Amino acid sequence: YLSGEAFAALRGHTILGRTMREGPNDTAAFDRGLARAADPGHLLHHLFGVRALALFGALGEAEGASYLSGLLIGHEVRAACAGDGASVHLIGAETLCGLYARAIAARGAQAVVHGEEAAARGLFRLSAEVNWQ
């Protein structure tokens, strides 16, 4: 998925970004985005709604980026996660894994966070088992 790249492009190079300002993650706004992603409808329709919410004052400048993040991550998780209670393993930065874990939990699955060092540990174990010549 290209959720991070889509977020950066939408935030930095579209009219949506003009309604947002930099700031810390707003958990309530992120959760609103997650909830909207769970509603019927497609991503483009929901993205149009971000602009409408901002224009009508229902989404403040400080909340916009977190809402957009929740919307994009929510759509990604909705597409990838069946919500059948299965575990989803996450590898990455703690903050980003936390957001994904929140979205996965909202879909009824369990996130297992391994952290940033998991890839390096896996490569090390693989190198120990493979005879490199």
Regions found by a protein language model. Name each.
Residues 1, 101, 107-117:
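Short hydrophobic/aromatic-enriched beta-strand-loop microsegments
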Residues 1, 5, 42, 64-75, ...:
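Conserved active-site and cofactor/substrate-binding residues in soluble primary-metabolism enzymes
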Residues 1-36:
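Glycine-rich phosphate-binding loop plus the immediately following alpha-helix
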Residues 11, 71, 112-133:
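Glycine-rich phosphate-binding/hydrolytic loop that grips phosphoryl groups
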Residues 36-79:
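Adenine-nucleotide phosphate-binding core of ATP-dependent small-molecule kinases
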Residues 63, 87, 111-114:
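Flexible, glycine/charged-enriched surface loops at secondary-structure junctions
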Residues 85-103:
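Glycine-rich phosphate-binding loops at beta-strand->alpha-helix junctions
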